[in-house]
């Protein structure tokens, strides 16, 4: 019998990641459990749940969400910690956005984007077709038994989710992201480094150009 799934929170949607993990971990067990309940108890609810677990499309959505939310949860947890380095948090947010963009847009275009352009970058102009996006090995493996038309629709919906996620992250990036990253040159660790001390010339130039 499958274990109880974590209760979903209406306000903390990121907490749903734990529920998604548990659902995937016991997917086959849950499918078998509700199939047996359908046959032995003639339970309508059990039948509905069995059909949901038997549908490969639902499994694909869960696999996509699990992989997509994993990195987001890590960064979100860092933001909630006490005494976190604000510059490090900003770098984590930038890297998170870049990781999602790497899924959506061609690599050659991603390499051309400067950090200070990330907030205003219109990714919808460069997003690849869902059929050309790689959603990961587990997703690809699970998609084998899904027909082409349905798979195309699933990929497009996953792509739309990622686009909106990127847009929301963009809204949370600071406008002076380039200067903030250069300020990290002045951290105690960098300032007292015996080798490879950072060149602060670019930082000084940034303040001069912003006068």
Which stretches of residues belong to each language-model region?
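Alpha-helical structural modules in large enzymes and assemblies
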Residues: 1-211
């Amino acid at each position: 019998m499958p274990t109880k799934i974590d209760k979903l929170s209406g306000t903390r949607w990121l907490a749903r990641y734990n529920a998604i993990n548990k659902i995937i971990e016991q997917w086959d067990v849950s499918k078998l459990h509700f199939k047996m309940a359908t046959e032995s108890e003639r339970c309508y609810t059990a039948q509905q749940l069995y059909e949901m677990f038997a549908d490969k499309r639902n499994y694909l959505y869960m696999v996509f969400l699990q992989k997509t939310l994993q990195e987001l949860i890590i960064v979100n947890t860092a933001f909630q910690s006490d005494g976190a380095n604000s510059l490090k948090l900003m770098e984590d947010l930038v890297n998170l956005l870049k990781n999602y963009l790497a899924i959506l847009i061609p690599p050659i275009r991603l390499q051309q984007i400067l950090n200070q352009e990330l907030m205003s970058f219109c990714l919808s102009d460069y997003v690849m077709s869902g059929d050309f996006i790689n959603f990961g090995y587990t997703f690809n493996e699970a998609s084998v038994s899904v027909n082409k038309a349905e798979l195309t629709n699933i990929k497009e919906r996953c792509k739309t989710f990622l686009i909106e996620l990127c847009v929301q992250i963009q809204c949370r990036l600071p406008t002076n992201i380039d200067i903030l990253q250069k300020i990290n040159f002045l951290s105690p660790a960098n300032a007292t480094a015996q080798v490879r001390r950072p060149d602060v010339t670019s930082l000084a130039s940034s303040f001069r150009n912003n006068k």
